[in-house]
UniProtKB/Swiss-Prot annotation:
Its EC number is 1.3.7.7. Binds 1 [4Fe-4S] cluster per heterodimer. The cluster is bound at the heterodimer interface by residues from both subunits. It is found in: Plastid, Chloroplast. NCBIfam families: DPOR_BchB. The keyword Nucleotide-binding applies. This is Light-independent protochlorophyllide reductase subunit B. Belongs to the ChlB/BchB/BchZ family. Pathway: Porphyrin-containing compound metabolism; chlorophyll biosynthesis (light-independent). One of its GO terms (biological process) is photosynthesis, dark reaction. Substrate binds at G484, M485. InterPro entries: ChlB/BchB/BchZ, LI-POR_suB-like_C, Nase/OxRdtase_comp1, P-CP_red_C, Protochl_reductB, Protochlorophyllide_Rdtase. The active site is at D349 (proton donor).
Length: 563
């Protein structure tokens, strides 16, 4: 445990509460002392929603410590059950209340046995000392999905549907896995307080609709736990973000043989890779259905991208080089004519950014995606790419290998700040903390990942996924870099940007003072190198133990650097 005034990923109970509050008609009860109950305020402040946050705090106070928590927790669960009749009540401790080592599962069992209980009650199965917010969210979502699918299996078993087949798999699984008539997909991992998640969900729906694929379920955001039994009916699952949803997809693949797409469609190239992965899955399902003597052709021929030349059901006479589903025309059309990003990356405006240095830091999905866009699609030199998702470090290294000079895996914002100060990039792409660091160093920053503040929960449509997302990212990248002659024009025409240069040290210790003459001389230095001159002068002053920078010190530093 460590004391910090900034955390990229919060404690585990925040992840559980984010998942619980994303579902409809699900209530969370947090067993915690005062001070751990800030989630309601945080979500109400950031998310632009009309509904109240469905979280109640069962406060651990001195009375609870004296008498025990069981009576109070059970009473709170029963009260919320009677007042709001939610479909599910989730009980979660926090890292603080976990110290009490109470048997919360026993509390849940007691509350579930109440005669008047109409809600399911579930204890979040999360180790609060070993996992962070994102890992806990992923685990909680998988736990809820597993709970309701196992519950549906039990219901079917009691109805006499279940038995055991030759492969030692229950026929209940097969019964649950009856697919939708037309190709369909589940979108897993869209949830509250995510980075542009609602906009990304709309863009994914539009993308799938263009491919003739229906949406089966979207979870957890806006989903109902009563509909979780329908998850196996989809043909495949889409996991737009690795951080949340991957465990659920792996469970569904293992139990119901459901394939999943875990390629995040961020950027022109990865969007095409994602679509081709969907194409591969649909073609595989089609051929398997033919071998199983299931006639799906009458349904699939209505898909706009179904190849009508596939007319043989005989595997011996069928041409295996011809794909039933072929999305290449859609990819080419979107890339060349619909998305503006591919054209913009070859324009003279974007070519002006070629070779400029950038630092990228964020969650694993967004940081890896933006790194590849900058390096592959826009010709920008990524001098450092990093993530705070230390649990996914191996995947991240594999993704960004060859696209950046250095890789930084840390959840300590001071290390990130020191790296940025050392590398002196032209722009930063990161979280809210990197925006603060950029302001202190006078380096522009584009926000590409959570955690973020209110301005990155926009009312307007701003996805980061899919082809519209590529346009948004291209705008963000271009607008994050300082324009060529902007500083000079503002100075020549006495523009509004006349603030004096600020100290660019991330530490408040040993700050140097500039006298008026030195500052005046510094202001005469061209804007695009002024920051570098200032940093070199301060470095020279510190090396020589000079507390105040005068005109003589400025010139001495210049001579020392030139020598």
């Amino acid at each position: 445990m460590k004391l910090a005034y900034w955390m990229y990923a919060g404690p585990a109970h925040i992840g559980t509460l984010r998942v619980a509050s994303s579902f409809k008609n699900v209530h969370a009860i947090m067993h915690a002392p005062l001070g751990d109950d800030y989630f309601n305020v945080m979500r109400s402040m950031l998310e632009r929603e009309r509904d109240f946050t469905p979280v109640t705090t069962s406060i651990v106070d001195r009375h609870v410590l004296a008498r025990g928590s069981q009576e109070k927790v059970v009473e709170n669960i029963t009260r919320k059950d009677n007042e709001e009749s939610p479909d599910l009540i989730i009980l979660t401790p926090t890292c603080t209340s976990s110290i009490l080592q109470e048997d919360l599962q026993n509390f849940v069992n007691r509350a579930s046995m109440s005669e008047n209980s109409t809600s399911d009650v579930l204890l979040a199965d999360v180790n609060h000392y070993r996992v962070n917010e994102l890992q806990a969210a992923d685990r909680t979502l998988e736990q809820i999905v597993r709970f309701y699918l196992e519950k549906e299996k039990s219901t079917l078993f009691r109805q006499g549907v279940s038995s055991v087949d030759d492969n030692n798999k229950t026929l209940t699984n097969n019964f649950l896995s009856i697919k939708t008539e037309k190709p369909s997909a589940n979108i897993i991992g869209i949830f509250t307080l995510g980075f542009h998640n609602q906009h990304d969900c709309r863009e994914l729906k539009r993308l799938l609709n263009n491919l003739g694929i229906e949406i089966n379920e979207v979870i957890p955001e806006g989903g109902s736990v009563k509909n979780l039994k329908n998850l196996p009916k989809a043909w495949f699952n889409i996991i737009p973000y690795r951080e949340v949803g991957l465990m659920s997809a792996i469970y569904l693949e293992k139990e119901f043989n459901m394939p999943y797409v875990a390629v995040s469609p961020i950027g022109i190239i990865d969007t095409a890779v994602c679509i081709r992965e969907i194409e591969r899955i649909l073609n595989k399902i089609y051929f398997e259905s033919l071998e199983g003597n299931v006639n799906t052709q009458s349904v699939l021929t209505t898909n706009p991208y179904f190849n009508s030349h596939i007319n043989s059901t005989n595997s011996e006479t069928r041409d295996h080089n011809v794909k039933p589903f072929d999305f290449e025309f859609y990819i080419e059309n979107q890339t060349r004519f619909i998305s503006q990003a591919a054209w913009f990356s070859r324009s003279i405006d974007c070519q002006n950014l070629t070779g400029k240095k950038a630092v990228v830091f964020g969650d694993a999905t967004h940081a890896a995606g933006i790194t590849k866009i900058l390096a592959r699609e826009m010709g920008i030199k990524v001098v450092c790419s990093g993530t705070y998702c230390k649990h996914d470090a191996d995947w991240f290294r594999e993704q960004v290998f060859g696209f950046c000079d250095q890789i930084l895996i840390t959840d300590d914002h001071t290390q990130v700040g020191d790296m940025i100060a050392k590398l002196e990039p032209s722009a930063i792409f990161g979280t809210q903390m990197e925006r603060h660091i950029g302001k202190r160093l006078d380096i522009p920053c584009g926000v590409i990942s959570a955690p973020v503040h209110i301005q990155n929960f926009p009312l307007s449509y701003r996805p980061f996924l899919g082809y519209e997302g590529t346009n948004q990212i291209a705008d963000l990248v271009y607008n994050s870099f300082s324009l060529g002659m902007e500083d000079h024009l503002l100075e020549i025409f006495s523009g509004h940007d006349t603030k004096e240069p600020i100290t660019k040290s991330l530490s408040t210790e040993n700050e140097l003072n500039w006298d008026a003459e030195a500052l005046k001389e510094l202001s005469n230095v061209p804007g695009f190198v002024r920051g570098k001159v200032k940093r070199n002068t301060e470095k020279y002053a510190r090396q020589n133990a000079i507390p105040s920078i005068t005109l003589d010190v400025l010139f001495a530093a210049k001579e020392a650097l030139s020598a």
